[in-house]
Amino acid sequence: MHRNLAATVLCCLAAFAPKAPASDAPTLDNRWAHITTALFCTSQDVDKLLTKPEDRAAALAYFAPLKLSKFYLENGSGDPAAVPVLRDVAAALRAQGYEVSGAVVPSNRGPLCYNDPKDMALLESKVKVLAQVFDEIIVDDWLFTTCTCATCVEERGSQSWADYRSRLVAEQSKIHLIDAARQVRPGVKVIIKYPTWYEGHRQNGYDVARQTPQFDGVSVGIETRQPTTQDQHIPTYSGYVLQKWIGGNAGAKWRSAWLDNYQMEGADDDFVAEVGQAVLARAPEIIFWCAGVLHPPRASASNYPHLAAMMPEFDRLAGLLEGPSRGIPMHLPIGSVGEYNIFGYLGMIGLPIDPRESVPEDTKAAIFTKHSLADPKIADEILARMRGGKEVFLTWPLLQALRQSELGRVLNVISEGGTVSSPIFRTHEGLWETKPIDAGRPFTFPRIELSTWPYARDVGLVREDADFGILMRTSYLGGQVDVLNLPDNTYDLERLPAEVLDAIRLCFFDELGVRLTGPGGVALYPFGSRQYVLYNMNEASEKVSLRFPKTAPVRGWRETMVGRDLPATPVDGGQGPWARHEIDVALTLKPFEIAVVEAP
């Protein structure tokens, strides 16, 4: 699954250029077997692409490769004159076998002020128009507010902006959005869409714990875009975690994943990787935003041929997935914030993440980050896991925040502060064995200097004056404590030498029964007891392996996306208590290739 497939459909898509076929061709039987797709149409898209029959026919032909099941039609004003137009377009689409719902972008001029009667009147008028036509309305993620007008500041009083705005938006949107729509159509369903920028949700008025019960359904964003250059810098794997975390919290109310290609010209593979996260998270529906940006003459339409080429592969992938998704339990209370998108970065180094709202109690290992500080009892709960003989994996920033508890005594830190840079790492291979690793360029980390004993540095960063802690592991209170120091540039996690990443992944071998070996930028998604999906999100081909316990079979391994047998080789780990005897299943992944590895 990579770029060259797009070339195979370029000529075909030329046939779908905006020209008018004689009539709309019925498409009721033209659906994906394993995924459901939908298209958001702004009010401008409705006017330009769907209002006139000849334009609509051309648009439906152009978007035919997406095999859409549904359209979301935006109403951009409160003018009642929009009602007959929306009714006509919706009726024409339904006649072609499509589902059709309404859509509202709450404001026309940036974030709303919920203390401004004009803004509230505009919101009401928009949804009242939509409720005359549709049984369901989805709300674009401009429901938030950043207003700091005199009224908002005065009304906030001594509250934090997060507490004030999350209450204000919930209360006012109930009155001026949900109730306003139901005044027109009592049974209308209103769906809230949560943006990808989870770290600012409550600060700007989104409150998942409060709003998911309030609304009839939930759509969760996967606007990861181009991770290294787009201004939000969201790792692609975050899109998967957000679906499992926020969508999973919604239960039966989880309706869809929502993705876009904003500022992604020339980043075709990153765009379709958003689709991949939705498919692997098993999103009930995938919404593409929006028709206008995927359609000529917009420059962003350059992403569309590759998207169209990849959709059959994603449908096939969805059909291959068997059993429940598995991952490393990670404590992520709803509404929490911590190290920015740390769950996405961990996923991008091959650690599959299973977000948990409460502290995991039934697992061998679990990950804790600063997000866990949303739980006021977190130190005691982590210590209880340790006393129960469990393994806890902590980020260094979390351990710093909890140093007044017993956790502050886990490591013997003799000096810290500032940063340290070096190209040389050292991994601990056994009681007296270590291995130096030259990364080829310097990496910068917060400086953590430990005493020689107890020897806790499984991975150190080597400078002339000391080995500094990167991955620290020690026993304490009958349990195992792992502490990960995060690089100054978080994206450098993906660039760490494979040997360093392998040491980090080894912490979770007993929990997962499998570990990835190889470079970063390759994500692992286990399903059931015998299926392992690998997604190489690098621009280069990568050699990777899946390592299993020595009792795993050595014959019968298959990769089912391409259809090939895979070799399995016993790995002799030597002698002694640190020896590891494993079964190695190796394969090479092309750029942005997805592989589905199945055990016998």
Predicted feature residues:
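Positively charged n-region of N-terminal signal peptides that target proteins for export
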Residues: M1-N4
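Bacterial N-terminal signal peptides
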Residues: A6-A17
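Residue-level detector of bioactive/disordered segments in secreted/extracellular proteins
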Residues: L13-A14, C149-E154, T427, E433, ...
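Sec/Tat signal peptide C-region and signal peptidase I cleavage site
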Residues: K19-P21
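Glycan-processing catalytic domains of CAZymes
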Residues: S23-I378, A384-R387, W396-Q404, G469-L477, ...
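A conserved amphipathic helix/loop scaffold
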Residues: K370-P600
